[in-house]
Amino acid sequence: MDEAARVGEAGFDFAEINLLHPHQAFQEIPSLLRIKEQHKFFYLVHGPEEGSPFDCARLRASLLPQIKTLVAFASELEARIITAHFWLDERYIQPPVLREKLAILEEMLMLAREKQTAFCLENLSERACDFEPAFRHFPDLGMTLDIGHGELLSPENTAYRFIETFPDRIRHIHIHDNRGGNSPGDDLHLPLGEGSINFPPILSALVQSGYDGTITLEVPPHLFVQQREKLLTMLSSAQNRG
């Protein structure tokens, strides 16, 4: 809640609320609505951690109820987008598990449809080909493209192929820096420019694809304003190159 107020005071158009424990968040709704009205912005909502990505029984028993609560919370705030982690990397998850996960994902989407809220999956280590079955099965499934995650476990940032292959599915962007790597510990969430990600060509590809949606800076809160100016400069350059 404090971070939402800080985002509003800095003049941002929206705040993305990260809900690690959705069931505990409802008591904050009145305060969050006051902040929204005060600063005339809107909300996006980010869901809880998936837990074990291989245990479908646990996902049904634990994650699905959390997603149901998350959707209800987002609806109360009139949040425009819900983002969830739901790992679909075919290199590590066996086909029978992936098939069951698609069935679980369909149930998540049904919950979001009931509240008329856009539902997006965020890429972790996945490549574009890993999202293809989900996009093929579910025409209304969106994507939150995490450019920082795209730098991990890949010789080339996976954002390029996502933008090339599924530009119409990208509804939101997460941006932060890192130095590449092959483990969760390499997901450093550094300020832009403090890692090794080459942002200008990625942003140029994004601009050329026609994307004009929201971008969340996933960097330390005290750097929000400074990083916003840096990002706006890079986006302006990308538009000029386009």
Spans of model-derived segments:
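Active-site acidic/histidine proton-transfer and metal-coordination neighborhood
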Residues: C56-G142
